[in-house]
Amino acid sequence: VEDDPYGDLYFDQAPPASLLSLSASVPGSRDWLAHCGSLSKVLCPGLRIGWLIANPELLARATMCKQFSDAHTSTYAQATAAQYLRSGVMPQTLARVRAVYAKRAQAMCDALRSELGDAVEFVQPQGGLFLWVRLTGATGQERDANALAKRAIEQGVAFVPGAPFFSQNPDPSTLRLSFATADEERIREGIARLKKAFKA
């Protein structure tokens, strides 16, 4: 299963080839691949349009599950998405969106470095909407993301503790920060509030 809602949200260099594109050169591999994508992350959060590329048997079963779940995706939303995609402006939209998210990601990384220093570790994101952070516990700082989350809320900022994202052996020192909706100034303010939560 290749779940790829953020694949088009790269900042500088395009990501490595998807399994879907690689499957074209490996005979029979498409029969074993299920590729999922979405417009809600790259175009409009309220436009709940996604797709599944898979073998016919899996598609038939997925269609049945979808129909039992909610009958079908809004016809209006589908028509709106189709018209937009036919218009040919998606490449320009993606370029603008990538530039916005790249600036937000940079602002978050810069703020984390200046405000929290060695209390956190992270890899600068090359795309997407999130930053994965590990609390180091340096100089006696917090290492428990759940405990920090409670204090962060008291400071007026929130994040998602990382443990639920693990399929096994969750790491309680991890957290996921989002730069999707806040502008650069609000991101800096949020990280400053997170610093206060460390000291609370």
Annotated model-derived regions:
Residues V1-A200:
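PLP-dependent class I/II
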